[in-house]
Amino acid sequence: MSNRIVKEKATAFSPYVITPHKMNYILPITFTDSLYKYPYEQVEQWSENLSDIEAKFQLSIKVPLNYNDIFIRGDSLYFGMTLESWWQVYADNISKPFRETNYQPEIFYVAPLNWHPFGSNTGFLIGAEHQSNGRSQLLSRSWNRAYAGLLL
């Protein structure tokens, strides 16, 4: 497996370690000239005041669900959670709401492979994830997906 995963496994059950999963970031200023306001117009009174300038951030963490090996030596099962938000922080006239927050829980299995090209570690992962904005009716969006990958 990649060196990162090997090092993460060494600290996985330390009570003071939070492991990042996907990229964590804060973009204090983002701009879009194509904000699709129609769904908001149907439910929110403030839709006409949405700003083209907003902040965006993503927080993503994971936790192991097993301490010992499951099927083979060095494998792990994880739960991951990613939140991605678009915040109308510069829209003073509508009290700076969060325009959208997407929630993405996932469960995935990671295992090492007995293949060491150029002396490196390799592995594979397989998982399932769901993404939803947590809204209902016209503003609702969600999807499910299964995935697999090779770790080099």
Task: Describe these PLM feature segments.
Residues M1-P105:
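Outer-membrane beta-barrel initiation region
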Residues L59-L65, P105-A111, A128, A148-L152:
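Residues on the lipid-exposed face of transmembrane beta-strands in outer-membrane beta-barrel proteins
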Residues N66-L77, L113-G123, L138:
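Short loop/turn motifs that connect adjacent beta-strands in outer-membrane beta-barrel proteins
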Residues T82-W86, V110, G127-N133:
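Outer-membrane beta-barrel pore domains and translocons
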Residues V89, W115, G134-S136:
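Residue-level signal for secondary-structure boundary sites
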Residues N93-E100, N121-G123, S140-N144:
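"Short basic amphipathic alpha-helical interaction patches in structured regions
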Residues Q131-L152:
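Detector for outer-membrane/organellar transmembrane beta-barrel domains
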